[in-house]
Amino acid sequence: MSINFKSKAQLWFPTTIFQVTLDDVSKKIINDEIMMEIKDHLNNPESKKSTYVNTDTNLHKSKKLKQASAFFNRAIFEYLKFLKIEHHDFEISGCWANISRKNFSHHNHSHQNNFVSGVYYCKTDKGKSDKIHFNDPREQNKVIIPVPSEQNIYNSNGALLDATEGVAYLFPSWLRHEVPIHKSEEDRISVAFNAMFTDLESLSKPGFSAAIRE
């Protein structure tokens, strides 16, 4: 006698990495703004000696980045909408450009005191496999690691995503991530940003009303 059954996997407690991809026209507009904003950093003789340069963290307030700032805000809004979060009153708390050069890598880190973080890629080198690595936040998943026949979202303990020009990734600010060694002779240019709710007092209200319980 054979035993017959049906099965299905249910994905719960997900860690959402939200991808936003610009069309070619929008990508050129935004990338031109970013390159104009950071040209002094690119042309600075001192900065050229370094493997990594970052700008001030208030680029979202720059008049030169009007379209880029609007894009970042819209991407954040779409991310919150996708998650069905009702609180859409937020503001960008920090925004800065990163200029990464050959042999630079960024350590494993998170972005504290924010709800959502993002990174937008302005310039990358496809031939050198530019990537960003997100780490599984579940420490228990690193204790026993069987070898899978094929890696997928159900058995992985990390996500290695392509850093592609015109693409932004948005993710929970608590999610730890890192950047592998940059192997290209060309600069990799990205813009990172964080956002936080402005109506925290409404978020912290108790989620129940008056009741009498037996």
Question: What are the language-model segments listed below?
Answer:
Residues 85-95:
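A short coil-to-beta-strand element that immediately follows conserved catalytic motifs
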Residues 180-190:
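Ligand-binding loop in jelly-roll beta-barrel domains
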